[in-house]
């Protein structure tokens, strides 16, 4: 327990919280190029083939990013926009690819929740 004099001299140091998406360097988004596009299986008890891409940013760092939605058109050398946000059942995947930006197309035939998947309003 510090004395009042010690608190006046030094004050309390607040804890520094570790970032959940360190590769973005505090930015909301980052532009990158796909190095690898593949499917991986989730942890127990879930079962699926989840789509993910390995993305290299301009500064050279590589991250694993999840491709949300049904179907995608990404391949190697595609330019993508990456945001933070983990996928709970995929270990090591802490980023999401933003649909409908750069080379990533929006999800086809999407009627609800379109803004998350880069889909235009149907006529």
Swiss-Prot record:
This is Small ribosomal subunit protein uS12. Transmembrane segments: none annotated. HAMAP family: Ribosomal_uS12_B. One of its GO terms (biological process) is translation. InterPro entries: NA-bd_OB-fold, Ribosomal_uS12, Ribosomal_uS12_bac. With S4 and S5 plays an important role in translational accuracy. Interacts with and stabilizes bases of the 16S rRNA that are involved in tRNA selection in the A site and with the mRNA backbone. Located at the interface of the 30S and 50S subunits, it traverses the body of the 30S subunit contacting proteins on the other side and probably holding the rRNA structure together. The combined cluster of proteins S8, S12 and S17 appears to hold together the shoulder and platform of the 30S subunit. The keyword Ribosomal protein applies. SUPFAM superfamilies: Nucleic acid-binding proteins. GO terms for cellular component: small ribosomal subunit. Part of the 30S ribosomal subunit. Contacts proteins S8 and S17. May interact with IF1 in the 30S initiation complex. CDD domains: Ribosomal_S12. Keywords: Methylation, Ribonucleoprotein, Ribosomal protein, RNA-binding, rRNA-binding, tRNA-binding. Belongs to the universal ribosomal protein uS12 family. It comes from the Bacteria. The gene is rpsL. It comes from Orientia tsutsugamushi (strain Boryong) (Rickettsia tsutsugamushi). The modification 3-methylthioaspartic acid is found at residue 89. GO terms for molecular function: rRNA binding; structural constituent of ribosome; tRNA binding. Disulfide bonds: none annotated. Pfam families: Ribosom_S12_S23 (PF00164).
């Amino acid at each position: 327990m510090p004395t009042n004099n010690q608190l006046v001299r030094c004050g309390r140091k607040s804890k520094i919280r570790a970032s959940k998406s360190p590769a973005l360097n505090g930015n909301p988004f980052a532009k990158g190029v796909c190095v690898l596009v593949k499917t991986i299986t989730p942890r127990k008890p879930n079962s699926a083939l989840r789509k993910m891409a390995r993305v290299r940013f301009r500064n050279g760092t590589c991250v694993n990013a999840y491709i949300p939605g049904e179907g995608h058109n990404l391949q190697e050398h595609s330019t993508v926009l990456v945001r933070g946000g983990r996928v709970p059942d995929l270990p090591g995947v802490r980023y999401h690819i933003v649909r409908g930006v750069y080379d990533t197309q929006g999800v086809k035939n999407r009627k609800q929740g379109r803004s998350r998947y880069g889909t235009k309003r149907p006529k």
